[in-house]
Amino acid sequence: MNNSKKWNYRRQSIVIKRSSPFYKEIDNLCFKSKNLFNATLYDERQTYFDTGKFKFYNKINKEFVKNNQPDYRALPAKVSKLTQMKVDQAIKSFLALKKSLNTGFKPHFPRYLKKDGRFVVEYEKGALSFKKKGFIRFSKTNIYIPTKLEKSVIQRVRLTPRAGYYLIEVLYRKPKIKYNKKKLTPQTRFASIDLGLNNLATVTSNVFEPLIINGKPIKSINQYYNKNLKKKQKLLPINQYTSNKIKQLSYKREMKLNDYLHKSAKFLVNYLVSQTIDILVIGTNKGWKQNINIGKRNNQNFVGIPFYKFKQILTYLCEENGIEIYEQEESYTSKASFLDGDFIPTYVQGKNTKHTFSGSRTCRGLYKTKNKKTLTLMLMVL
C-alpha cells in the first residue's frame, strides 16, 4: 500500500547562523559530503567514458565500502549512502532528459561541485538519537536540536547549505484529513485565485466579494536586493563571485520573502475557512516564468517572485483545513471573455494557431468586453 496516500509530509526548519555553536561542525559535514559527491561522480564519469555505461548506486556503493574509500568513511555509513544516492539521481535525471528532449538541446553531464563548496547532508531516522526528550541528536556528532515533534512522525533530517547560513530541515509526516471529493455544481462554495506582480493574489468567489493580496512588498524586497547586489558585486576582486556581505544580503532577502509568503497564505486560507469554501481553483501556466517577456524591468521583478513556493504553502494549508485544490491551465484567460461566453483554448508549444475573442485588452491590467464594459484584467482571468 502506498503510504503517501495516508500521510502529508511537512518540514520544520531551523536556521543555523555563523554564531551558532554547531555552525563549524555542520560546515565540516557539508564539506565532507561535497567530497564524497565528487568522488562518486568521478568514478561514475570514468566508468562511463571507458565503457559507455554507468555503475549506478548499488554497485558503486559496494565498491566504496569494500575499498574503505576515505571520503565514504569520513561520514557515518547511513549518511554517506544518501549522498551517493543523490549522485545516482543526478545521473538518472541526465539520462531521462537526454531521452525526452528532441529539440537539439543537449543536457549537461552532471558536474563536479566546487572544491571549496558544500553539499547537502541527510540523516535518516536510524542515524538519529532521541534519548534526550525534546531533542534530536545526529549520529557521531555533538549536534542536537530542539523539537516538539514526536519520534514516531519524524522521517529524516536534512542539513542544507545556504548563502551565509545552514538550514536544518526536520522532515515529518501528518495524517491526511479525510474528506469526500466535491464536484463543481452551482451550489459548491468555491474561490479562484490568480497570481501576479503588483497583486500577488487576486481572489474571487461565488460566496464573497473579490479580494487582493498586495504584491508590492515583494517587489520592494527584490528591488532593494538587486540594487545592493550590483553595488557589492562591483567591489569584488577579479575571479571572485561572492562575499560574506553578498551572502548576508541573500539571506535577509530569503527570510523576508518566506515571512511575507507564509503570512499572506495563512491570511488567505483563514479567510477561506471563515467563508466555508469547499474548493480553491489556482491558475497555472507551464513555463510562464521561463518564457515570459514583459520588458527587462518587469521580467526581473516577475521571475524574482517565488510563485511556486507560494502555491506549495497554499496547497498544504488548504489540505490541512479540508479545502480541495484544483489547478486550472490559463494560457488564454487574459484574452478570452467569460462574460461573452468565449471558448478558452489551451496553448500548445510549436503550434501557431490563431484564436479570436470577443473582447480586448485596452491597457495593462484592464479588459474591455464585447458590450464595452471595462473590467480589471485579474478578475477577468478568474
Where are these regions (language model features)?
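Well-ordered beta-strand positions in beta-sheet-rich domains
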Residues: R11-V15, R156, F190
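Positively charged, helix-rich recognition surfaces that bind polyanionic ligands
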Residues: Y166-L382
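Catalytic micro-motifs at enzyme active sites that drive phosphoryl/nucleotidyl and oxygen chemistry
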Residues: N2-S4, T147, I154-R158, R173-K182
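Short coil/turn segments at secondary-structure boundaries
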Residues: Y42, Q46, G52, K98-P110, ...
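Acidic carboxylate diad motif detector
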Residues: F56-Y165, Q300, G304
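Generic detection of short hydrophobic beta-strand segments and adjacent strand-loop junctions
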Residues: Q12-I16, I143-T147, L211-I213
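Short amphipathic alpha-helical coiled-coil/interface segments
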Residues: C30-S33, T83-I91, L249-R253, K311
